[in-house]
Amino acid sequence: TPPPANRAQLRPPIVDEMRPTTLDGYASKPSTIATFEAVFPNAYHIRSVLPIPSQEEIRDDGVTFCWCPFDQALREAGPLTKRVLHAMEPHLEGHKRFIYIDTKIQYFRAGDVPVDSQHWHVDGSIVARGPQVQALGHNLLHDMKARLQRPSLSPKLLAYQSSRHCATRFVTVPVSLTMPELIPNFDGLDQAVRTLDPPCEAQPASSIVSFDGLSLHRATAAEDDGWRLWVRCIETDREVHLTRPIINCYGTVFRTLPQ
């Protein structure tokens, strides 16, 4: 891990896709965060459905990736992941500077969760830290207004999940709601979406779906025991530098212990 003085030098410049333009406006404003009318288009589409792999194929695929460049992942992937990446290629838009691959091979017992939250959220949010954020009483803020008001800058994503027993849920219709311009976490957004209860869909087994940084989705608990391969492809202008905490959390299965 580089010393603190060098970490700032390693940080890539902020690209327009990730620029917290709303936060910039708070430099001379009171410390109360305003609300706005947020519209989530929820551009979720099923792009292809592949043959459902066997549990042995998933278990034995062997290699997982964390923010890995697409070309490298394609070279080094196991047989199943390689088939998925080849199937994703025709659906890449090719308008961003970087294409990254994340994958997980996880074994779930019924009730296990693939990530640390089942909140409704969006991927690739604009995250801000620093003195301006601290002046508003937080260590971190997601600039939701900046993302939603500049949809053309959003990252583009593809996702694959192999199995029936643990499927991501996606909202399938546009959703409008009033929310803070800047949020420290997705708790309030999750509550608002659950209250609205919009139509949503579980990603079909062994399907590839497309969505973007304005698409509400959430993890669900596994309904049964078994292996699952999950693959996410993100096209973004943001250059990612991995840190040990990011690597360590990937692939963790979250389980509620009996009381």
Give names to the regions the model predicted.
Residues P2-P3:
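Intrinsically disordered, low-complexity proline-rich regions
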Residues P13-A205, G213-G226, C233-P245:
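Non-heme Fe(II) oxygenase catalytic core, chiefly the N-lobe of the double-stranded beta-helix
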